[in-house]
Regions:
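Short helix-initiation/N-cap motifs at beta->coil->alpha
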Residues: 69-78, 98, 170, 216-231, ...
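Pocket-flanking alpha-helical
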Residues: 72-109, 121-135, 247-254
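A structural signal for short loop-to-beta-strand junctions that line the ligand-binding cleft
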Residues: 87-92, 110-152, 170, 180
């Protein structure tokens, strides 16, 4: 009798799993919707969401509605705090890892439940003397891709000016570049703010501000948005400037413009952290999205758009003429950040403490005196 009951129970479980019991719908492996809030560029997040939706269709025959709420890092962070554990989105993606730590302390993130294989493939940190964390030791966030904040330049414009290809930060101070450098103010761009911090933390406060004033003297424009810098450089209107690959820089290269990217020593590198918000309505879809991005297929989304893999397991490579190989050319031959030394001095705590004073000093010493600084060069 007991054996018959066991057989019937097994049959019922199988029937439920296959949806063979009338009126009973089998549970979906993940929810059919996913929403994220992110400062990551549309060029990247649209491609990642589209690739995941296709993967979900192939894997579970499930149509997942995906959507992204674009917001700058401070705005995104502020919204999450305001939601107080009842978020309107499922995932927070991009920005400084220190903000993710703050959200963890406020119990606004859910602990990730990634497979051990996915978690272990990502190193704990990269860079010296100040290691950049690539995953949260407490398990609440994980990096998705490596993206340096560096410089773009137009080789033909440089040649016309008699200036060698840009390799270092100091190359921007070449007198021959006067009026030909583009930048976006740190008051308008978090990436510019991070680069200003790199200079200040590399040289020290006094020498750092002297350097930044000299750069302002060489600058011919302060753009309204950071993404405008690679656009004006690509068109040959300016020779060089601060840029991030995913904010128009690589897109300009794909569009056929003569533009190159370099990450000088100590350039800030973000791991583009990702976390699931506490109280998310679609936690299974969110977890599946993160797992997907850490696969080779997911990492390829980044590698074909000028970013670098978060793990040494993969490197940027593809067929001749592919977008991946164009990305390698664009970055001067770099295929992985794990194949060479990474120098990092950026300290989140210092940057956070100086955030407002940096902007105040910029307005007083550079923005208000820009014309004087240009005449002094």
């Amino acid at each position: 009798m007991r054996g018959m009951q066991h057989t019937l129970l097994r049959g019922l479980v199988l029937a439920l799993a296959l949806g063979l019991v009338p009126g009973v719908v089998p549970a979906q492996p993940i929810e059919d919707e996913l929403v994220l809030i992110t400062p990551v560029s549309k060029f990247i997040h649209d491609a990642a969401l589209k690739a995941f939706a296709q993967y979900a269709k192939e894997t579970w025959n499930l149509t997942v509605k995906v959507n992204a709420l674009a917001a700058g890092t401070p705005v995104a962070y502020g919204r999450i705090v305001e939601w107080k554990g009842r978020p309107e989105v499922d995932i927070f993606w991009g920005g400084e890892s220190a903000l993710f730590d703050k959200l963890t302390d406020q119990k606004l993130l859910s602990k990730l439940e990634l497979s051990k294989a996915a978690w272990d493939t990502i190193p704990a940190a990269i860079g010296k003397p100040n290691p950049i964390p690539l995953r949260d030791p407490r398990g609440y966030w994980v990096g998705t891709a490596l993206e340096p904040y560096g410089l773009v330049y137009h080789p033909r414009v440089l040649k016309r000016l008699g200036v060698p290809d840009i390799k270092t930060w100091d190359d921007l101070l070449d007198p021959r570049l006067k009026g030909n450098v583009a930048q976006c103010a740190p008051t308008r761009s978090s990436s510019s703010n991070a680069t200003y911090e790199v200079i200040l933390q590399s040289l020290g406060e006094e020498k750092g501000w002297e350097w930044l004033k000299k750069l302002a003297g060489n600058s011919g424009i302060f753009t309204a948005r950071s993404r405008d810098v690679p656009s004006v450089v690509a068109k040959g209107e300016f020779a060089a400037g601060f840029a991030v690959p995913s904010y128009m820089a690589f897109e300009e290269r794909l569009a056929g413009f003569d533009i190159m990217f370099v990450a000088p020593k100590n350039a800030y590198v973000t791991p583009e952290p990702m976390a699931i918000l506490a109280g998310a309505k679609h936690p299974k879809a969110a977890a599946a999205f993160i797992e997907f991005l850490l696969t080779e297929r997911g990492q390829r989304v980044f590698m074909e758009r000028g970013l670098f893999p978060i793990t040494p397991k993969y490197r940027v490579e593809g067929l001749p003429g592919s977008d991946a190989e164009k990305a390698v050319e664009f970055t001067g031959g770099v295929r992985s950040y794990f194949e060479g030394d990474v120098s990092n001095v950026y300290d989140d705590a210092i940057a956070n403490n100086r955030s407002e004073s940096l902007k105040t000093k910029y307005r007083a010493e550079i923005e208000a005196k820009w014309e004087e600084l240009k005449k002094a060069r």
